[in-house]
């Protein structure tokens, strides 16, 4: 057994392999309809490998030690033969790599090739995370009968588009990915790319932003220029958007995601579409970032994928399995979003308070401030894009500093407002979609509103749960900014406090708003802005949480 793979498999907690003796056929030519030849490797048990179910992975990241040790070898040692193919224009495959644009045609042609091979039996399972999951959606509505299941992990059917929303432009992930892809075929390219995150971050501070790729890699990148110049609703992206195919999937689908994953909203959208269409689908969401998955992903490929490939039923469980943070336990539900959770607003108030009662002109009778006039003045802060509010934890595709972290240092900044409840008398469980409406005004027309939900523990540490950002183009007038936060499943325990942060950025996760109204790719100057957050009876700023009702489903411990 490969030593690196052995160490990874132990860390993932996988069952012992069925065999350690594998045969590897490298650089198998796979012809495409246009004459381009893609290369693939086949991994299979030396004894009895022919006719086993095929796990098909199509990847732009090569066929080297990192991907084979962590994904290919574990499957090939436990009941699959694995085909790992390099996407067009990458790692020996012919043609030019145009991110996401050729995956439908190439994927369908590859499936046709697999079923014609002498070692093929009767079943294929599509499996893989991120880009390797996206390519599954690209062919999902035209699968041949030999495909028995899909297991897309930390991915969605439109991949890039959620980052490029005009009202919430997420810079770090697509830019960082573009930089990584541009240099990955250098010696140790992917590893070097991960280690050069600091250089990439500095590049994202370049003005104008359209020159940031030159700062990072020494030349312009077609993909990076595309993400800077085309918003999500631009027809330019139509060919990479496979959301319309999701409802037409005919095979069982098991989706695996993370609460701090970059693709979570789209992945949950895809799952909801499958459920609404009556498809055989199940969902698993854990406390992970994009780069911090545990063995759940591989176990799902083995338990669910092999069962479907053999015509058997996977081990029984609920259609939706969620890790409820705070409780730190797995729970099963029947659907997403689960029933039994009702929207409850928590209102921002004066002196940094957060409460279920809306703001009133005078404090309620019986309160310590009864009989005194309420402080209804807006809270103010100054946002300077030259010293932007930093991204701390949360939804980021970085090696460290993502996911749940203590936000106390961030909340000490003068450009971050916080609103906090009193210590909770009982647990508050939140599962589902989270949104906020913040009454806001800026000294400039163009401004951003970033909202983060946190859990403040008994020691006073503030742990981020979920967050989101929206961009405004008429912010110099008092306006209700609607912010869509990441979905979540979290239990705020008795004695803890619920906190809401409000600021105007999270850089470099989201691009800086220069305040000038110029296009993001060409803006060459930065303007500081004075921001106001209102919380009076006429402007009731609030975050709305899906709070569990008494007797709601999902009480079964799935651990």
Model feature map: region roles:
Residues 209-245, 251, 262:
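Mobile cap/lid helix-loop segments that gate and shape the active-site cleft of serine hydrolases
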Residues 45-116, 164, 171, 413, ...:
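Cap/lid segment of the alpha/beta-hydrolase catalytic domain
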Residues 127, 134-198, 259-262, 277-308:
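A catalytic-pocket lid/entrance helix-loop region that shapes and gates access to the active site
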Residues 262-268:
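Conserved alpha/beta-hydrolase "acid-adjacent" motif
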Residues 33-45:
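A short loop-to-beta-strand scaffold at the N-terminal edge of the catalytic core in hydrolase folds
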Residues 249, 255-257:
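Short beta-strand/loop motif that positions the catalytic acidic residue
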Residues 3-15, 24-29, 276, 299, ...:
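Glycine/threonine-rich phosphate-binding loop and adjacent beta-strand/alpha-helix elements that clamp
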Residues 118-131:
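Alpha/beta-hydrolase fold nucleophile elbow
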